């Protein structure tokens, strides 16, 4: 299905017996490269946004065209959401140098062949609109929280922190099966190629996002109000400037309809620092305990395969 194609039928997409996303398939997909629109994968619907502003899809039929024709898409949606990152030329799907705990040359990753083929063929890919959330959690996760809980990519969820890089990779790759998605799509932990290309897309709107992502939840963010895990008045809370406070997903300011690539939690990627046996993995983007200029969306930080309260992850979806 392409944007503007309203011929797709079908029932609620998503996981088996999932009361939020139902079972079955919404619409169809020809998966042909689209020169005049974005390909919507089987089992998903177009919600709103544009190729330039950040086109949002959802795996719940209830969200279909809710923000059609609008550049900004709200968070009051039912399904898991992804944002299209257009890539006109495969040469633009690349890693970019930003500040980090070590120099750029210390970090490495070979472009996965399946990602290259998908991005080159479809002229883009989808990235999770939010950090991965914990579907079962009724409060923020704590040390020792289960890593068998289901993932969400929705607003108002507890960030899926206290997870190792190995666990994050497994959870991201298993999301497709969890949701009973079509065999034509693949879900993965974000690579450095996908991360940096998403930043490049965002920087068409906010030119310094990779180096100063003040829209996210940082310790030095301006004071703002947010809603706790349960969407009730008693959970209306304030995050004050100068305080490091983890908050639910989708509570800050989106750029191109994407939330918190900078701030809230560091996010595990598949990039490596191979020269280190002690700290061979890479996290990106800073957290609620850091500053937005010192640890912006582009920042790289090496670490061991440990579960931390300030670290979560983000999914990508490839056609």
Question: Where do the protein language model's features map onto the residues?
Answer:
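Residues that flank catalytic or metal-binding motifs in active/ligand-binding sites
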Residues: 78-81, 121-123, 254-255, 261-264, ...
